[in-house]
């Protein structure tokens, strides 16, 4: 297993979990990042890529749709949903319309920010980029004054990029959903986020089962054409009435996918099976489980020495390091 991160190995504890580690360039520099991946796959004879962040997925999505001939030079499979499914997932506006028209679940209709300049509306509202990630650019508008301020500070182009929706109060519900199109299997495991960071990562959750919500997720995954593991988010407006409003589908692992593993279902293994033709394990998690995340400190000094001793230069200025036999975390 070859791992990549934008930071040096000695800064990243998980660099100990892979056989070889490379420091990658920022994916926002798309051409440089594409060249990095091509060189890396060739050097390490990697036959599979598994992108884990939205910005990486956006690069690969453009690569395989707009630069198809160059993408073939990668000579590796990308274990990700098909381009059409990813395109829909990465556009919150199109996804909401897609689900609403098919009546698959409750959605929150919205309008572009530019349209609100001449409209009267009720508050509070939520404004967010239609292709945003990790709550970046998210704004809560409590009044007309908040709206006027946002309109004043946004360019005309930015006004077209913002989607504005009514704000619905409630817990954020995250559902890990894995679909194997060949076997027809779809497994879903929801969790209620009790504490979360400002960029939307849950730190204390309650894993639970809900037949109605899980069926909605199965219907969505099938309609969109999902393959592998994705993460769907909802607002739980009323727990007793099973009132859930769809927020988005991230076409990747959730940052909190380990919560599903802790509850008893290995989503990473299930994702791999969706691309290797194997059947998924049955999901046997029952009841409620409260699971909290904590951080621990690790000394990386021994890894520093290994990194220096094993450091090599690649054509894309990455560093690689063989994993020591005694490395552990």
Predicted features along the sequence, with ranges:
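Short, charged, surface-exposed secondary-structure boundary motifs
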Residues: 12-13, 31-35, 81-82, 87-93, ...
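Active-site flanking residues adjacent to catalytic metal/cofactor-binding acidic residues
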Residues: 4, 127, 165, 232, ...
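ATP-binding N-terminal substructure of ATP-dependent carboxylate-amine bond-forming enzymes
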Residues: 1-78
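Short glycine-/acidic-enriched loop or helix-start segments at secondary-structure transitions
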Residues: 13, 59-62, 136-138, 174, ...
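ATP-dependent carboxylate activation and anion-phosphoryl transfer catalytic cores
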Residues: 44, 209-329
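Glycine-rich phosphate-binding loop signature in dinucleotide/nucleotide-binding domains
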Residues: 40-46, 120-121, 157-158, 240
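Active-site nucleotide/adenylate-binding loops and adjacent lid/helix of ATP-dependent enzymes
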Residues: 86-169, 180-184, 211
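Phosphate-binding site of ATP-dependent enzymes
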Residues: 144-224, 235-245
């Amino acid at each position: 297993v070859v791992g990549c991160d934008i930071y040096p190995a000695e800064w990243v504890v998980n660099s100990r979990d892979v056989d070889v580690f490379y420091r990658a360039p920022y994916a926002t520099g798309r051409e440089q990042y594409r060249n990095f991946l091509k060189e890396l796959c060739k050097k390490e004879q990697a036959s599979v890529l598994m992108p884990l962040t939205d910005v990486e997925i956006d690069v690969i999505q453009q690569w395989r749709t707009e630069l198809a001939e160059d993408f073939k030079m990668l000579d590796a499979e990308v274990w990700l949903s098909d381009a059409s499914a990813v395109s829909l997932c990465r556009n919150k506006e199109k996804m909401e319309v897609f689900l609403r028209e098919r009546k698959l679940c409750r959605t929150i209709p919205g309008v572009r920010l530019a349209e609100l300049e001449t409209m009267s509306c009720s508050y509070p509202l939520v404004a967010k980029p239609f292709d945003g990630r990790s709550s970046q650019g998210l704004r809560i508008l409590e009044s007309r004054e908040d709206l006027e301020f946002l309109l004043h500070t946004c360019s005309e182009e930015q006004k077209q990029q913002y989607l504005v929706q009514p704000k619905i109060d409630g817990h954020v519900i995250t559902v890990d959903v894995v679909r194997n199109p060949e076997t027809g299997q779809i497994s879903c495991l929801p969790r209620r986020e009790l504490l979360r960071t400002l960029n939307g990562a849950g730190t204390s959750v309650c894993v639970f089962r809900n037949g109605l919500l899980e069926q909605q997720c199965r219907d969505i995954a099938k309609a969109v054409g999902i393959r592998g593991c994705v993460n769907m988010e909802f607002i739980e407006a009323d727990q007793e009435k099973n009132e859930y409003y769809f927020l988005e589908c991230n076409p990747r692992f959730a940052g909190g996918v380990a919560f599903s593993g802790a509850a008893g279902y290995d989503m990473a293994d299930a994702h791999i099976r969706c691309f290797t033709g194997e059947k998924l394990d049955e999901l046997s998690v029952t009841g409620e489980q409260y699971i909290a995340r904590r951080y621990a400190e690790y000394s990386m000094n021994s890894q520093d020495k290994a990194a220096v001793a094993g450091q090599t230069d690649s054509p894309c200025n990455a560093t690689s390091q063989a994993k020591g036999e005694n490395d552990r975390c």
